[in-house]
C-alpha cells in the first residue's frame, strides 16, 4: 500500500521544481544580452551588420510575415533622417518601412524583407551580369532614384550594397541615412557617401548639386554591373580619388556595347552640367523597353500621390478595413496612423496585411481549398466510372448533361438542405443484368436522396462524394419534375379502356405539342425485386407492383386500343431491370409524404419540362403519369397542413408543371385540353373561364402564382363557378377521365363553403344577364361570411334519391317569384345559384311541369355542388354529364312537384 504522506511530499517537490525552472528561465531571459522578441516581432537570426548597427530576420506574429529588423543607437544623427524620409516613400522599387520601435537605448526599424540579398553579392556570384538583366535592373534603380528626386530628396549614398533584390529579382533601394531634402538649384556642402562612388565635386570638396552626384553614382553602378569591376578603384584611397578627378574609365568593346558606352560616358561626365537628367536616362536606347515602362509607371504613381486621397480607395483596402472592423479593430485609429505616417504598431499591422493581400491577388495560380479540389476529383472519377461498360451512343447525351454541372452551384451557400447519394455501381449476374440509364433519373422535384441505391456502394463513402454525386445527377436531370416509373402500365391501360377507374395518365398538351405516353418498365412475375424503385411520395399514393403475367403483346394491344402509341424501343427485355434511387424527404416531419412531392420541381430554375432520352439516344415521350385521385388541386397538397406553414418548399411554381386533365365534350370526337399559354380556357360544355380552371390552381395553394404565402384571400373570392354533373346516367362517359375523391389528403386552412355563397356576385351577374334570376344579394358582404357550419348546410340542402353519391338540392320552398323560363341554346345548360345571404332567387320554371288547378308553376329544383377546390365531401367529377339535372327534376315530379318533399 502506498504511503499517502510520502506521495504528498513527492507531489510538492515536483511542483517546486516546475516553479523553479520557470523562474530560472524568466531570469535568464532578463539577464541575457541576446534578444528574442521586439514588440510584435520574434527575432529569428542575424543577417547583417554594419557601422550603423545590426540587421535581424524577424517574424511578425499577427500576420506571420517576415521582416528585417534594423537596429541603431538612439544617439545616431542619421537614424532620425532615415526614418523621417524613408516613411515618405511609397514606391515598388523602394523598400517599405512598416514600423519603428523606440526603446531606451535603441531604435528598431521593421523594413521589407528581400530574400535576394544585396546586388553586390549577386554580382560577386555571377562576376558579370548580362546586358539584358543589366538594362532591367538599372531601369528599376533609376526609377527609384527618379521617384526620390521627384519628392525633392537626394540619396547621396547610392551603391551596390544599398540595393537589395526581392524573391522575384527586382531591385529595391534602401538605406536613406544620408538622404536630405534638396530643392532645385540648391547647393550642398556635406561630404558623404563611399569614396569609389563619389563624384569629382565631392572629392574636391566643392559645393555640389545633390541630384547630379546621384547621377554620377548611377554611372558607376552601371559600369560595374556590365564589366564586373569598379571604374575607379585602387588599393590606395588617394589614388582612387585622383583617378575619379582626372582619368576616364576604360571601355572594353567586347564587353560594353556602343549604346551602353554612350550612356555610361554621359553619366560619368566630369562636368556636372553635362550629366543627363533621370528622365533622359530612362529614355536612353540602352534601357529600352524597360526604361520607358518604369518612367511611365513612376509618373503615374507620383500623379496619384500628389492628387491625394490614394489611401483606402482600392477594393483590397476597403475589404481589409471591413474585415478589421468586423474583428473589433479600431479602423479609424489605423487610418489616422497611416495618413499621419506614424509608423507605429497599427501602421505596421495595416501595411503587412495589405502586402499579404496583394500577394494573394498577384498569385499566378489562385489557391483552392482541399475540399474544392477533392470534390473536383470525385466528379471526374465518378464520371469515369459511370461510363465504363456503356456504349458511346448511350453515353453521348448523358455526358453532355453531366459536364454542365458547375462547381459553383455545388458549393452554393444558398443551399438549405443536405443531400447524400452514393454513386451507382453495376453488378452482372448470370440470369439478369442491371442496366442503368444515365438520363433515367429525371426526378428534380425531390431535395434529398436516400443512402441506399441498388448496387454496391463505393468504399470511400464520404460526404463530398455524396454531394458531388447528387449534384451531378441533379444537373443531368434538371427537368420533368413528376417523372415516375409505373409497373402496372398494362393494368391501367386496359382498365381505362373499359371505363373503370385506374391510375392511367392524362394526355398533356404543353405549348401545342402533345407528349406521347411511354412505357418504361415491363412487369416480370418471376421476380420479387422491383423493376424501378418507386417514389413513395409522388402523386399522393404508392403505385402497386403489377402481379399479372402480362406479355409485351398485351401491352402493345392495350396501348393501341385507347390511341396511345407505345415506343417499341422502350419495351425492354424482361431480363433487364431499371433501378432508380429511392427518394426520401428530410425537410419536414409535420406534413404528410403525399403533400411533399406533389408539386413537382422544387427548384425554380429546373421547372421547365423536357423529354427524357432513351437508350438509343433518341428523345422519347414522358412516362405515363398517375391520374390525380381528386379534382382537388395537386398544388394544394404542397401546403403543409396550413398555408401558414413555413417549412414548405420555397420554390416558385409554374402553371405548366401541373397535370392538366383533358375533358371530353359530349357529342364531340375532339378533346378539349388546357394549355398553359392561353388565358381563356374552354371546358367540355363550351363555357369559357377566364384565367383559371376548375381547381387546377388551388384556392389554398401556397405555391400558386395567384396566391401569396401570407393571408391571401384572392382564391377565396375567385372560386370557380359551379356546374352540376352526374355520372350515373351517362353510359358513354369515359371513366378513365373521371376524378375520384382523394382520401387522406390534408384540409386547407379556409372554412367550408356553403351553398349560399358566391364569389362577389360574379355568378349572379352572369346569370342575371341571361335572365335566369334577379340579383338581390349584396356584393359588398364580407368574404369571411362564406365560412359557415355544417348545420346550416343541413337546413338548406335536401338529398335526391338514387344510388351513388348524394346530390345536394337547394330548398326553395317559399322562395318562388315570378320569372321567365329561359334556357341556353342547347336547352339544358342550367347554373347553380350562389348568394351571400338568404335565398332570394328567381327559379326556373318548366313548361311541362305545371299545376293546372292552381295555375302555379312547379319549381324545377336546381341541383348544385360546391367548389371542388376545397376538398369537400360533396366533390364529384367535373366531367359528369347533364343528365343529373333531368334526373333530379323527374324525381321531384314523381314526388308531386314539391321540391321539399
Swiss-Prot record:
Record domain Protein kinase: where: 41-287
Name of the protein: Putative serine/threonine-protein kinase YPL150W
Segments of skewed composition (Low complexity): 588-599
Active site, UniProt feature: 157
The EC number(s) this enzyme carries: 2.7.11.1
Biased composition (Polar residues): 600-613
Residues annotated as signal peptide: none
Residues that hold ATP according to the record: 47-55, 70
Chain positions with Phosphoserine modification: 456, 533
Record-level GO cellular component terms: cytoplasmic ribonucleoprotein granule
Enzyme class: transferase
Membrane-crossing segments per the record: none
Annotated region described as Disordered, given as residue ranges: 500-530, 588-629, 745-770
Family statement drawn from the similarity comment of this UniProt entry: Belongs to the protein kinase superfamily. Ser/Thr protein kinase family.
Transmembrane is among the record's keywords: no
Amino acid at each position: 500500500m502506498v504511503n499517502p504522506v510520502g506521495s504528498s511530499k513527492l507531489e510538492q517537490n515536483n511542483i517546486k521544481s516546475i516553479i523553479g525552472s520557470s523562474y530560472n528561465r524568466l531570469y535568464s531571459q532578463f539577464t541575457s544580452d541576446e534578444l528574442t522578441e521586439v514588440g510584435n516581432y520574434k527575432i529569428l537570426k542575424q543577417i547583417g551588420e554594419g557601422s550603423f548597427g545590426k540587421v535581424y530576420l524577424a517574424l511578425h506574429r499577427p500576420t506571420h510575415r517576415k521582416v528585417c529588423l534594423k537596429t541603431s543607437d538612439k544617439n545616431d544623427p542619421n537614424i532620425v533622417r532615415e526614418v523621417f524620409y524613408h516613411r515618405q516613400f511609397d514606391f515598388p522599387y523602394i523598400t517599405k518601412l512598416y514600423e519603428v520601435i523606440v526603446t531606451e537605448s535603441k531604435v528598431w526599424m521593421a523594413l521589407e524583407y528581400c530574400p535576394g540579398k544585396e546586388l553586390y553579392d549577386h554580382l560577386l556570384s555571377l562576376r558579370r551580369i548580362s546586358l539584358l538583366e543589366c538594362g532591367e535592373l538599372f531601369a528599376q534603380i533609376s526609377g527609384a532614384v527618379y521617384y526620390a528626386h521627384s519628392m525633392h530628396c537626394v540619396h547621396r549614398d547610392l551603391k551596390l550594397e544599398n540595393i537589395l533584390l526581392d524573391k522575384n529579382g527586382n531591385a529595391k533601394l534602401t538605406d536613406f541615412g544620408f538622404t536630405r531634402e534638396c530643392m532645385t538649384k540648391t547647393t550642398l556642402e556635406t561630404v558623404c557617401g563611399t569614396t569609389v562612388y563619389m563624384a569629382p565635386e565631392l572629392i574636391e570638396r566643392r559645393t555640389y548639386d545633390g541630384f547630379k552626384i546621384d547621377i554620377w553614382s548611377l554611372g558607376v553602378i552601371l559600369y560595374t554591373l556590365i564589366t564586373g569591376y569598379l571604374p575607379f578603384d585602387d588599393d590606395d584611397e588617394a589614388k582612387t580619388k585622383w583617378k575619379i578627378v582626372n582619368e576616364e574609365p576604360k571601355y572594353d568593346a567586347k564587353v560594353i556595347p556602343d549604346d551602353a558606352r554612350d550612356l555610361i560616358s554621359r553619366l560619368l561626365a566630369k562636368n556636372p552640367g553635362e550629366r543627363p537628367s533621370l528622365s533622359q536616362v530612362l529614355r536612353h536606347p540602352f534601357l529600352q523597353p524597360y526604361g520607358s515602362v518604369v518612367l511611365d509607371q513612376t509618373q503615374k504613381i507620383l500623379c496619384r500621390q500628389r492628387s491625394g486621397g490614394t489611401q483606402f480607395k482600392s477594393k483590397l483596402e476597403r475589404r481589409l478595413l471591413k474585415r478589421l472592423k468586423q474583428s473589433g479593430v479600431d479602423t479609424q485609429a489605423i487610418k489616422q496612423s497611416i495618413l499621419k505616417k506614424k509608423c507605429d504598431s497599427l501602421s505596421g499591422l495595416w501595411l503587412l496585411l495589405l502586402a499579404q493581400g496583394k500577394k494573394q491577388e498577384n498569385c499566378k495560380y489562385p489557391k483552392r481549398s482541399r475540399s474544392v479540389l477533392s470534390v473536383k476529383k470525385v466528379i471526374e472519377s465518378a464520371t469515369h466510372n459511370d461510363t465504363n461498360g456503356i456504349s458511346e451512343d448511350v453515353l453521348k447525351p448523358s455526358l453532355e448533361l453531366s459536364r454542365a454541372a458547375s462547381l459553383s452551384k455545388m458549393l452554393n451557400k444558398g443551399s438549405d438542405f443536405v443531400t447524400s447519394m452514393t454513386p451507382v455501381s453495376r453488378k452482372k449476374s448470370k440470369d439478369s443484368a442491371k442496366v442503368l440509364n444515365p438520363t433515367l433519373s429525371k426526378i428534380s422535384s425531390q431535395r434529398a436522396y436516400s443512402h441506399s441505391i441498388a448496387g454496391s456502394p463505393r468504399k470511400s463513402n464520404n460526404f463530398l462524394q455524396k454531394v458531388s454525386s447528387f449534384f451531378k445527377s441533379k444537373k443531368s436531370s434538371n427537368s420533368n419534375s413528376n417523372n415516375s416509373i409505373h409497373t402496372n402500365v398494362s393494368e391501367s391501360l386496359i382498365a381505362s379502356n373499359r371505363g373503370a377507374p385506374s391510375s392511367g395518365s392524362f394526355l398533356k398538351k404543353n405549348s401545342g405539342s402533345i407528349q406521347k405516353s411511354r412505357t418504361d418498365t415491363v412487369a416480370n412475375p418471376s421476380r420479387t425485386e422491383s423493376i424501378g424503385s418507386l417514389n413513395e411520395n409522388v402523386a399522393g399514393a404508392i403505385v402497386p407492383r403489377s402481379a399479372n403475367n402480362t406479355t409485351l403483346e398485351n401491352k402493345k394491344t392495350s396501348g393501341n386500343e385507347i390511341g396511345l402509341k407505345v415506343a417499341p424501343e422502350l419495351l425492354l427485355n424482361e431480363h433487364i431491370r431499371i433501378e432508380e434511387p429511392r427518394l426520401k424527404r428530410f425537410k419536414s416531419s409535420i406534413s404528410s409524404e403525399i403533400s411533399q412531392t406533389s408539386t413537382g420541381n422544387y427548384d425554380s430554375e429546373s421547372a421547365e419540362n423536357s423529354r427524357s432520352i432513351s437508350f438509343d439516344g433518341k428523345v422519347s415521350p414522358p412516362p405515363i403519369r398517375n391520374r390525380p385521385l381528386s379534382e382537388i388541386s395537386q398544388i394544394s397538397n404542397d401546403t403543409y397542413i396550413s398555408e401558414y406553414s413555413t417549412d414548405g418548399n420555397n420554390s416558385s411554381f409554374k402553371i405548366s408543371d401541373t397535370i392538366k386533365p383533358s375533358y371530353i365534350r359530349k357529342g364531340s370526337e375532339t378533346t378539349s385540353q388546357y394549355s398553359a399559354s392561353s388565358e381563356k380556357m374552354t371546358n367540355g360544355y363550351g363555357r369559357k373561364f377566364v384565367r383559371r380552371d376548375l381547381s387546377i390552381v388551388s384556392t389554398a395553394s401556397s405555391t400558386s402564382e395567384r396566391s401569396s404565402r401570407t393571408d391571401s384571400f384572392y382564391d377565396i373570392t375567385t372560386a370557380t363557378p359551379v356546374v352540376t354533373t352526374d355520372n350515373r346516367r351517362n353510359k358513354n362517359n369515359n371513366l378513365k377521365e373521371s376524378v375520384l375523391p382523394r382520401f387522406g389528403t390534408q384540409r386547407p386552412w379556409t372554412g367550408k363553403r356553403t351553398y349560399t355563397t358566391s364569389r362577389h356576385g360574379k355568378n349572379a351577374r352572369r346569370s342575371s344577364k341571361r335572365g335566369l334570376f334577379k340579383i338581390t344579394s349584396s356584393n359588398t358582404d364580407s368574404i369571411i361570411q362564406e365560412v359557415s357550419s355544417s348545420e346550416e348546410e343541413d337546413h338548406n340542402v335536401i338529398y335526391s334519391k338514387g344510388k351513388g353519391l348524394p346530390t345536394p338540392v337547394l330548398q326553395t320552398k317559399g322562395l318562388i317569384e315570378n320569372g321567365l323560363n329561359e334556357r341556353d341554346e342547347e336547352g339544358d345548360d342550367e347554373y347553380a345559384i350562389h348568394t351571400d345571404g338568404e335565398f332570394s332567387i328567381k327559379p326556373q320554371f318548366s313548361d311541362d311541369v305545371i299545376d293546372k288547378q292552381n295555375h302555379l308553376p312547379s319549381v324545377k329544383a336546381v341541383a348544385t355542388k360546391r367548389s371542388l377546390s376545397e376538398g369537400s365531401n360533396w366533390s364529384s367529377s367535373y366531367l359528369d354529364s347533364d343528365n343529373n339535372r333531368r334526373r333530379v327534376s323527374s324525381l321531384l315530379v314523381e314526388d308531386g312537384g314539391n321540391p321539399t318533399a
